[in-house]
Amino acid sequence: MKLKYLSTILPAQDGEAKISNISCSPNGSRAAIACSDRSVALLDENGVQKDRFTCKPIDAKYGKKSFTVLCMTFSPDSSRIAIGQSDNVLFIYKVGTSWNEKKVIVNKFVQPSAVTCLSWPFDDKILVGQLDGKVRIGLIKTNKCSSLYKTDETVVSIQTHPKRTSFVSAHQDGSIILYNFSSRTQSKICTLQVPPYNLVFTNHGLVVATSDRRVLSYTENGVVQQQFDYNDQSEKEFSSISCDPTAQNVVVASYDRLRLFSWSARRGAWDEGAPLEIQNAYTIGALGWKMDGSTIYAGTVCGGVFSVDCCLRRGMLKSRFETTYVAPSHVILRDVTNDTRTNVISNKGLAIDELKIMGKDRYVIGYTSSSIIIADTESQRFSELEWQSGGHEKFYFDFNNCCLIINAGEVTVVEYGVDGSLGWVRTELTSPHLLSVQVSGPDVEEHKKVKKLAYLVDPTTISIINLINGQQESFINHTGAVDWIELNERASKLLYRDKRSKVTLVDISSDQRSVLLSFCTYVQWVPMSDVIVAQSGDNLSIWYNPDLPEQVTNMKIKGEVEAVLRDADRTEVIVQEPTAKVAYELDNTQIEFGAALEKRDFDRAVAFLESNTSGTDAYSMWIRVAEMALEHGNLFVAQRCYAAINDVAKVRKLHDILEIADEASISIGGDGTHFYKVRAMLAIMGRKFKEAERIFLEQNDTESAIGMYTSLHKWDEALELAKVLNYPEYEQLKTSYLRALSDTGQDSKAAELKVSDGDTLSAIQLYIKSNKPLSALSAANNDSVLSQDENILRQIADSLVKSQLYDKAGDVYEKLKDFDKAVEYFKKGDAYGKAIQLARFAFPEKVVTLEQEWGLHLEYIGQYDAAVNHFVEANDLKKAVEAAIRAKEWPKALSIVENIQDQKVRTGYYGEIADHYSNKGDFERAERLFVEAGLFNDAIMMYGKNNKWIDAFRLSEEFHGREATISSYLAKAEDLDEHGRFAEAEQLYITIGMPHKAIQMYDRVGRDDDVLRLVERYHGEHMHETRKRFATQYEERGDLKAAEEQFLKAGDFRSAVNMYKDSEMWSDAYRIAKTEGGENMEKQVLFMWAKSIGGDAAVKLLNKHGMLMEGIDFACETGAFDLAFDLARIGAKDRMGTVHVRLATQLEEEGRLEDASKHYVEGNKPELAVEMFIRDNDWADAERVAKDHCESLLPDVYTGQARRAIEEGDHLRAETFLLRANKPDIILRYFIENEMWPDALRIAQNYLPHQAALIQEEYEKSELRNGARGVDSFVAQAKEWEQQGDWRKAVSALLKINRDSTDNDALIKHSTEKAADLVMKFLMGDEEYIGAALGALDEANCNEKAAELLLLFGQSRQAINALCRAKQWAKAKQVAQEYLPEMVPEIEKIYKESLKSEGRLGELIDVDVITAIDMMIENDQWDKALDTAKSQNYRPLLDKYVAQYAAILVHRNDLSRVLAVLERYGASANPANFSIYKLLMEETLAKPRFDYTEIARVRNVHLDVYNALQKESSEHFEEFSRALWALHLIAMRTALEEIGDSVPEVQKLCLKQSLSLLRYTDILVADRIFYEAGAAAKDYGSEYESLGFLLLNHYLDLVDAIEEGNGELVDYSPFENSDIPTEVSLPTRQWLESAKHEEMKEWVLASSVDDAHAKELVYDKRGVFEASLKDKRGTAEPCLVTGYPVIESTVRIGSMVAEKDNLNKFLVVIKSNQTENLLNVQNFVAKWAGSPLAISL
């Protein structure tokens, strides 16, 4: 906090005029200054003096100057000021809350001594410190004072704790006493050395500023915390002290100075702030801190008052609210538009970290580290509650006096002005429309306050809780989801609307619900009333009295209701009509009537009713006022109300009551309404008889209580009360009661009284007389004597018959042993159960007839379900069935029908029952019944009517043939198609196997989603193509979003991007590129987007995505330099040079060198222009640019020109340019390297004289090393001698040029070959020169020239060897073929070795493919080697290497790779490979679960071998044929098992395949094959269960043999009439896991004790096992589908056969359950058989 001088309030005087006290009001609107002239100046909130009044002496006789003002303080409500004076009096002045109120003394407390200090902690209590040492308390209401405690030392200061829990008093002797309000005890906590005149009580203890220039801090227990000592500084004694409203800051005043101390929560101690120096202020004797904490008023000894601004910092919110932090925990918010101020204070002392303005700028939210503060700027109330904010809370300010905080499913209610939450609930439904809260304002009386919350527990349940006690008041369940709720102002009623727009009103106290409207678009309570306004269509409905929801007022409107507005004069509904807003005025008088009742203003309500007598609901309103008046004891108003509605009885009654009250008022005083008879009679009027009884009995007025009941004819209550009270005239009362009953004909009631008195016989007679025979019978049965009296019983029986109570009469006759009459009356009374029960022992022959009659009776009365059993008992099954059908007991009806012997009758009923099951949806049972009844067409029509076309097709095919069915159903499908019933048409098309027609249908009508669905299901390979086609169509139609979706689903995002690019919808193109195309595509589209818009927009776009630099680069790369310049100019001027250089580079590539040079220069890269011209040998331009822009490059230009001159051999020009470039060293080095010694010496002497001697020395060494002229001389000599024709000397000179004379290999080779040419031309007869030439040629490695010389010399072999050394293989071979043919193989061998050593495989393949392949294999390049072998089109060669590679892979255990190799290059029929094929098969079939893909691959390999062996007619053909059949059956079964057993045909096909596999157990895993076959047979059903038992039993034998390692333990005798092998190799371990093995073992053991399971195979008509191919006639061909023998219904498929039914089933399964594996099986079979599969008719 900082202190800053603000302004002068009161100017200082020339002499002493001490300001004795300054006090600020708690509401912050006023400040009072006690001046030296005994007047009090009043300041407003801005520090401007608004008023002044003069203080009074204790008595006017003492004069105005007889006292001084010693102390002063404001009351807690800021409306009064207490002033303590030296003349032993304390005055309290009422100053009011406005400036125009008169200042009057309202309290005067005369004290025994002067009042030295004051504190006013409570409205009705004030603390007074006196000169005599007493601390007293003044009671404002009684105007009396009493002493709290007394000391002997003057009280110099009193300070109250900020929380008003205690206070301290400081005394002249330095002692400080702490007084606790709750315990009413005081204790001395410390004693100072000097009087503690300047004392404040803060939240953190006491702060005392003493006259010895020290500031001390104490705890509440009197322990010193801190001490600030200013004795060593230029400080004078402290004269006053003040604490801010938050008790976090303290200001201490002295001479010309204010010192500030602030509490540090982090340190837990006081920190001293910067002091404020005020020149010429002198001693500051009074301080007052304004309650908003922003300003301190300081009064001086000279009468001056100035203000000091104290704040931490200032700020602005929303450019409207000025924030002033006067403390970390205190912020003043000022609205600059109207200058209103709001305090936001943390009462916990926590720093306010953040402020937010919400709720239409009315509410302020302050956040601290652990709490939240909510302030209402209009009511100036704020609340603080504990809160840990995550930043996700929401605030609802739509409710009066409170707000709601929504956070993480919790709703917290906060009442303004009350710290802490009012309550909270948990709910996920937190919309403001689903919450309603009513909290009464502070002006409402405490007992009338309402605090309730209504919320939704779930979408259909409303809960209402009382926030005062936290109890749930109501729990409302609704049938539908609720979308709006609201409580009325008194929270007595709730309105809610559900999502079906039905509005319901709930009375919370009675839980009574009333539906107001079934459809409502707007509903609302009228503000400040219980009137409801709702809109339904063009009707506006108003309920002025919600207690009578049926009374509604309607008016027509022409728009939608927007709001309901109310002021003092009128209430209007604002309706938005088509052209304008219209206000519809409501009946404000009726609204006022409700308000009057709410305020209990009965006179006003009666006046309203009297002036509105014509209302339709006047009667109910009079009743309402009357009842409320009675409830509140206003009898005259109640009488007036009843008179208005002509209720004469109540008017008279009230008249009587009023007379009694008037009489009572004379004796008991008051208005007499408290007299007990008045209260009792009012209770009787309200039908509260028990309360009236209580009132009478409380006064011992028994007669009146009993008389009340008898006058009301409540004799039972009168007798009961008389009996309880032992009323002496009880018997007489009872007699009077009986007489009254007899007079009024209430014999039955008299009989009850007789029964209670024990006179049963009289009671029976009375019951019979009153025609209540049942009561008479009950009374007789309860009397042991009368229950045996035959006469009495017959009288009762006759009375029962007369009353037509026949069943009861039958009971009586049965009791009298008169069974005929008993049965007769039982029948008459329809008590057939009792009749039959009686007839079973009395008349057994009548039982069946009675059952039949009972059934007919039940049928007559409609109890058909009960009649069924009785018809059955009567053996009338037809009637039983009909009754069961009429009772809709269909299972019972069906069971009865099945017991009817007549087939014709039974069939008729089947049809009717089937119709029921059809309608019910139990189609399977209905089908069975229809078929049973022979109603095949009805069954088919049933399925058709219910769109179950598959079942309809199945039945139609079964009963009408397949061809006719397909034809009719195709026509039906087309008809459905034509009539727009596409879903049914689709189902039919698919059922008959024509999904393409369904696709065409949907495509024709534009139902693209259905097209895609069917294509995906039946033609998945065309899915992407179809999506692209649709996308193109959508694009053409302009539906780009749909086109985008299809492009993306087709995986063609580029087309989607291009589509949006073509449409210039760049944002969409960019979105797709970003999400689908990756970073490069994203950038590319973004840059093209920028290119399309250009300018500032392009720069903004690229900057938005952080791609400006990349955009410039992209523009340059794509040649869009105009865009690049724009982007660089607008957004990146530093890149302009780069763009110029990039453009120059492109221009250079295009040959536009002049333009390029300009851009190089503009790009600040002239050196690149120079280099460009140098590369182009444009020396003039290079020199020009270098001179103009970069002279440092001129030497490079000249050097380049020199280099060009050297290349052209122009040494003089080169020398000139190098000298211009100032580089003589380069030309010197050039002359030396080229042994141009004279020129070198010249340059050195002229330009590099320091090197001249060195060059001269080198020149001499060179001459010495090369003889006269060195090698050049030999060349010159040879040329000269050659010209002269001296060939020998020429050759000799040339041969001298060798490695001894020079290192120039080219010169040596040239000279040697020249010498050889001369020898061949002129010296062939001279062997010496020939030899010398050959030696030189060999030394110079000129083998080809040597071969030429040797060939001329006749040395053919040596010539050929020379050509081989020269790698001239063709020439060598040509020479060999001509001169030495025997050397040709040797040459070829050498050639191959050369190719091999050099790795030249391409050439080696052409020469020796075997060697080349072997080289590849050595390098582990098997794929390349096999491809090379395959390219030779020689199968044995390929088979050889395939077998070799396969063997290696097998050794590596890489069987998957073996399969891949065999699939790629084919499997050969070489027996050497058979072990590999066998291993592949064993390993694949050894896995726990068969994998179709792996089995299919092994099967395909075996097919290749099979075909090869078949062509060769190999002896191994049969072996591979069996293996292939086994693999084929396993693969087909595996593919079918993927579908599951849901398709019946699949299970049968899999079973047959499993049984067929038994014949291959000698090459398969025997225990597995037997187990799978046995399990399949067992699961199929009873037909094959015995076979399953046999096979599984054999499987167990095999497992036992495996465990024992002895194959002889297995018994094969059950398989004699089959082709199942009897000798199989046992595996090393069992295949099945132990758990399943044990399960199957238990089943076999359990089945072995069942005689139904015989150990035998299933035989066919051949007399052999049905899966066996062999029989007595020979061997049958196996079926391609099942492996079963094909005996009849043969279908020929290429070279193989299939059984017709099985083939058709298999193909139907493929069509209806198409899978990739089934299609693969179909293709394999077609390939194997050599013909495609097709359904056979």
Swiss-Prot record:
TPR repeat boundaries on the chain: 700-737, 803-836, 848-881, 907-940, 979-1012, 1037-1070, 1137-1170
Location, primary (coarse class): other
Entry superkingdom: Eukaryota
Phenotype caused by lack of the gene: Worms display defects in ciliary structure resulting in defects in ability and osmotic avoidance behavior.
One Pfam family it belongs to: TPR_IF140-IFT172
GO CC terms of this entry: axoneme; ciliary basal body; ciliary transition zone; cilium; intraciliary transport particle B; non-motile cilium
Gene3D superfamilies noted in UniProt: 1.25.40.470, Tetratricopeptide repeat domain (1.25.40.10), YVTN repeat-like/Quinoprotein amine dehydrogenase (2.130.10.10)
Transmembrane intervals: none
SMART domains attached to this UniProt entry: WD40 (SM00320)
WD repeats: from-to residues: 14-53, 63-103, 110-150, 151-189, 191-229, 233-273, 511-553
Subcellular location: Cell projection, Cilium
InterPro entries the UniProt entry points to: TPR-like_helical_dom_sf, TPR_IF140/IFT172/WDR19, TPR_IFT80_172_dom, WD40/YVTN_repeat-like_dom_sf, WD40_repeat_dom_sf, WD40_rpt
Tissue occurrence: Expressed in amphid and phasmid chemosensory neurons, where it appears to concentrate at the base of the transition zones, which correspond to the basal bodies of motile and sensory cilia. Moves in the retrograde direction along cilia and dendrites, suggesting that it is retrieved from the distal endings of the cilia by a retrograde transport pathway that moves it along cilia and then dendrites, back to the neuronal cell body.
Gene Ontology biological-process entries: cilium assembly; dauer entry; intraciliary transport; non-motile cilium assembly
Keywords of this entry: Cell projection, Cilium, Developmental protein, Repeat, TPR repeat, WD repeat
Family to which the UniProt record says this protein belongs: Belongs to the IFT172 family.
Assembly: Component of the IFT complex B composed of at least che-2, che-13, dyf-1, dyf-3, dyf-6, dyf-11, dyf-13, ift-20, ift-74, ift-81, ifta-2, osm-1, osm-5 and osm-6.
PANTHER family per the UniProt record, alphabetical: IFT140/172-RELATED, INTRAFLAGELLAR TRANSPORT PROTEIN 172 HOMOLOG
Function according to Swiss-Prot or TrEMBL: Component of the intraflagellar transport (IFT) complex B required for transport of proteins in the motile cilium. May be required for ciliary entrance and transport of specific ciliary cargo proteins such as che-3 which are related to motility. Required for the maintenance and formation of chemosensory cilia that detect chemosensory cues.
UniProt protein name: Intraflagellar transport protein osm-1
